[in-house]
Amino acid sequence: MLAVFMGLCAMLWPPTGDLYRHTMDYFAFRELSVREFSYYMEVRGESRFDFLLPLLCFLFAKAGIPFEFVRFLFIFITYMLTFRVFEDCIRKNPGIARMSAAVFFIFYFSVQFFTIVLGLRFGFAVILLAYGAWQYLEERKSVGLLYIALSCMVHFSVIPVAMLLFLARFGVRINNFWISLLCVGAFLFLNPNVLMRVIDILPVSDGEKIVMSGYVSGYWSGEFLEDHSLKFQIAKYLSFLMMFPLLYFAFRNKSDRPLCSFVRLLIPVVFICYAVSVTMFFRIGLLFVPIGAFLFFSGSTVNSPFRIRLLLICACLSFASQVYAFRREAAISHEYMLFYPATVGFSSTFSEQWINRHVYDDGALRHK
């Protein structure tokens, strides 16, 4: 029921940021034929990898299903998968059963609800990848491969991380010396120019290279934070507060389990992303928080109550920081309909007229 409730919250959130673009695409898809949609995908360059969201929007548009139900579906699945891992962790590690309520809220608050709702693609992709890693590496179930494949179809940028996952599955390990060396090297030698050269040789379309370049050396590499207040910038970093203790716990974890190997391979990636691009750092954080939590709570030994309380505090502060960062969007949202009968909320939609009245073409709010 909680997953349904969060899905309803997603339906009532205003379409700003990337969500604005996806919503306007949905409206445009209502007028397209199958052939026109195929041509649109070829022009956009999204037909090779991350075609799942546009395809889903097209199908919903042609079926007359409001776009808000796409959001509901993504958020509902996100929380259902997260809660399934919580149940698996309680089963695998009875030592934390006595603190199951605290652990549950850690899992609940660790989900970056607002980031996933506003962007849809990447946030949902990393949840699918994290759950796929859990099933494939920890549970040794081949169904994990399906979730990994779906994650790549939602957002192509998770493909390099998926490659690390397979390296861990086939026995690649990294010790603390190499982790430390790579992290220090990232700060000393890595810069956007190096990444730009790497992007140039990647086997992806020119359009995808332009998008990736924007995250490395353009506006989204960090300049976007300058458009916001210092309080917003602090709130943005605090929303990933839970990642820092999880990084330390993973660094200290020397288990030979494939899941542990995968998480430890991600540690230098986090530092590399931070050295190159703030946006890349936030994005890898979206993956590291859930997968790091999965590793921590699946351990065979009894986890320290202090560590669990620490993670709970970090998770609560992270969620509160998200609420603060997106308080302006909340002010014009339809979240007040949560106090109405559920049928009212599920029938609520954001029309093109409402969007044009409240949101600029770049996805920013008209009234701040």
Regions found by a protein language model. Name each.
Residues 112, 143-167, 272:
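Membrane-interface alpha helices of multi-pass inner-membrane proteins
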Residues 14-15, 20-36, 162-283, 327-356:
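Alpha-helical transmembrane segments and terminal signal-anchor/GPI-anchor hydrophobic tails
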Residues 73-92:
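Transmembrane-helix motifs of polytopic, lipid-linked glycan transferases
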Residues 86-108:
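Transmembrane-helix signature of polytopic, membrane-embedded enzymes
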Residues 129-143:
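Membrane-interface transmembrane helices that cradle and orient dolichyl/undecaprenyl
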Residues 20, 24-28, 40-65:
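Short hydrophobic/aromatic helix or loop-helix immediately within or flanking a transmembrane segment
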Residues 103, 114-129, 154, 246-303:
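Membrane-water interface signatures at transmembrane helix termini and the short loops
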Residues 303-323:
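Signature aromatic-anchored transmembrane alpha helix within multi-pass, membrane-resident enzymes
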